[in-house]
């Protein structure tokens, strides 16, 4: 009996983004290559579970080692290969497994892989320009994921919980989690591994203290972690682009008139509600992220669309420089070949 091993290497990119970009005294930029996952039994001993390993510097492939009898869910059309198994016939792949993220109005299809023995599989990103990253949940912190389509794969153990919230479809659950800045999001909690797909390159920003803050475009945030509901509420806030002017020159009669004060409070409350709703519906707003926490940032690289001219392309007629000579009575006359066509 012989076994063949497969090695896949991705060449290093010619252009490398400097590691000091976005780095500071308290802001740390790290790659996402710590990929071994372990859980702890009740007796304190470690047991190896499903392992995710990213391949390459800007990984578009992930090698996943699946333990026996532990289901692995992979987004449809993302499985590249299944290999390194004693018996591939013992690996069951269910292609009709639908996993509905209904609170976000997104219907996603996942393939379910489960085997009686350990096997490996390769999973690819959605696009060649995207980058894969691994979230390892150990039960101490939860993660917020903004886009349900960014989830590529996850292990189906009972300790891992994935919940999706939408403002208009399950308002009370959405408001109870305190992350009111985001219109829809997913909450990952428990223990397990989740493979995410980021647009462009993905970097991990470490905000080490409460004083560390960073302003990001909202759609560039792939995921961020937190301890509890209150922590998530304070994690992300809208960035105010203008400061409200304090009207010190208001007439004293306004302060003394309770009806006008109540009216102004109602107007301010209405304006704040409309502004919050406008920010929630918009995708180009900037938000302020406060530490301490880890933020996954995606560069959102998009290929420029090919532009074609609106007018019809036409070629200029080529000039004819071909001539012929005619000898008549000792004289030589040169004429262009177009004269032959005119005679016809």
UniProtKB/Swiss-Prot annotation:
One of its GO terms (cellular component) is mitochondrial inner membrane. Coiled coil: none annotated. Its main location: mitochondrion. The keyword Secreted does not apply. Residues 1-13 form a transit peptide. It is found in: Mitochondrion. Disulfide bonds: none annotated. GO terms for biological process: inner mitochondrial membrane organization. Keywords: Mitochondrion, Transit peptide. It comes from the Eukaryota. Belongs to the AIM24 family. This is Altered inheritance of mitochondria protein 24, mitochondrial. The lineage of its organism: Eukaryota, Fungi, Dikarya, Ascomycota, Saccharomycotina.
